[in-house]
Amino acid sequence: MAKKQSILSPIIRITFTFLVLCGLVYPLIVTGIAQAVMKDNADGSLIYNDKNEVIGSKLIGQNFTDPRYFHGRVSSIEYKAEASGSNNYAPSNPDLEKRVEKSIEEWKKQNPTVPVTEVPIDLVTNSGSGLDPDISPKAASVQVERISKITNIPKETLNQLIKDQTEGAALGLFGETRVNVLKLNLELQKLLK
């Protein structure tokens, strides 16, 4: 019995010590450093409106369907962050072809003057997460004609808006040149008022 207690006592102490260190101390230290060094990122890169209300995140895409606004990528999960993921069909899967054809048909209804051959792939395919907040500058540019026609905002103004909101590759190396759809639409909304 005494031998059993002598073995259990250090095991219990070590378990409790690591529980406190890994479950409490480490997360608090990491959170504290993140809040001090990069508060915006640590809080989820939230975007606020003029009333200081959260309207979205720079990191999570939103579904824009109003033809006056720029549209983002297709999302098979309808931009529900808790369901992050995508079907990620193989190129040989007939379901991928059906999904892309459906996206192209929807595109043609909203943008009848833009030839299908000019539609960038990111407007008719899912991202891996289904939550991608960005599109390519070309994907934004092919929507200019529709938005200009509906809103009477000159194409030159919309193209400048895209240029102003275009972000380069991270550190000049990682990723692609991109436009955050939510930020772009917030700037567009200022012109619509």
Swiss-Prot record:
It is found in: Cell membrane. Pfam families: KdpC. One of its GO terms (cellular component) is plasma membrane. Keywords: ATP-binding, Cell membrane, Ion transport, Membrane, Nucleotide-binding, Potassium, Potassium transport, Transmembrane, Transmembrane helix, Transport. One of its GO terms (molecular function) is ATP binding. Part of the high-affinity ATP-driven potassium transport (or Kdp) system, which catalyzes the hydrolysis of ATP coupled with the electrogenic transport of potassium into the cytoplasm. This subunit acts as a catalytic chaperone that increases the ATP-binding affinity of the ATP-hydrolyzing subunit KdpB by the formation of a transient KdpB/KdpC/ATP ternary complex. PANTHER family: POTASSIUM-TRANSPORTING ATPASE C CHAIN (PTHR30042), POTASSIUM-TRANSPORTING ATPASE KDPC SUBUNIT (PTHR30042:SF2). Belongs to the KdpC family. This is Potassium-transporting ATPase KdpC subunit. It comes from Bacillus cereus (strain ATCC 10987 / NRS 248).
